[in-house]
Amino acid sequence: MLQPLVDPSTGEAFQDLDKFLENKRVALYFTAGWCPMCTSFEPSLIAFRQAAQDSGKPVEILYVSSDRNKDASLQRAASLGMMAIPFGNQTAELKQRYKVWAGSESFEFGFGRRSGVPALVVLDKYSQELAFVAAEAQGLKALKSWDLDDDLGIWGT
């Protein structure tokens, strides 16, 4: 489901996914660089990621873009220090699977979404949804719904 990721600093596919995600907690971050709510949420998300790392509970957040084009997507993911899901079909599949997309994408994906951007889908070690972080609706307090102590959320264990 997640392979390959794109290293936004090079634009190339990142192939060694299992090793990269080993012993980390993983979330899909549905976002867009043009979205004011997303850009205001991101400093807290980055601080959360760093605090998790510092506490010995590393987190990997994967960028799922609602940006206007591939270049904007790669640039934004790189600025956040995140690996990216390849722009296009893979991001579309994830948006449909988890029912999360930007309002401007409703004509493409429909109106039956559970959330817009920003939002995170926390995955368990089997790539199944473990938790939903509804940042669009709840803002910064939404990060409290991510239980970093749940062993199901640690990949490669």
What are these language model-derived features?
Residues 28-29, 61-63, 84-86:
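Structural recognition of the beta-strand scaffold that forms the well-ordered cores
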Residues 23-25, 57-60, 81-82:
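Loop/turn elements at helix/coil->beta-strand transitions in domains of secreted/extracellular proteins
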Residues 115-157:
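Thiol-/selenol-based redox modules, centered on thioredoxin-like
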Residues 32-35, 66-69, 125-128, 137:
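Conserved beta-strand elements of beta-rich interaction domains across eukaryotes
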Residues 30-47:
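Conserved redox-active cysteine motifs that mediate thiol-disulfide chemistry
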Residues 2-26, 54:
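A short beta-strand-turn-helix
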Residues 42-78, 94:
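Structural microenvironment flanking redox-active thiols in thiol-disulfide oxidoreductases
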Residues 66-117, 121-122, 126:
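Thioredoxin-like thiol-disulfide oxidoreductase module
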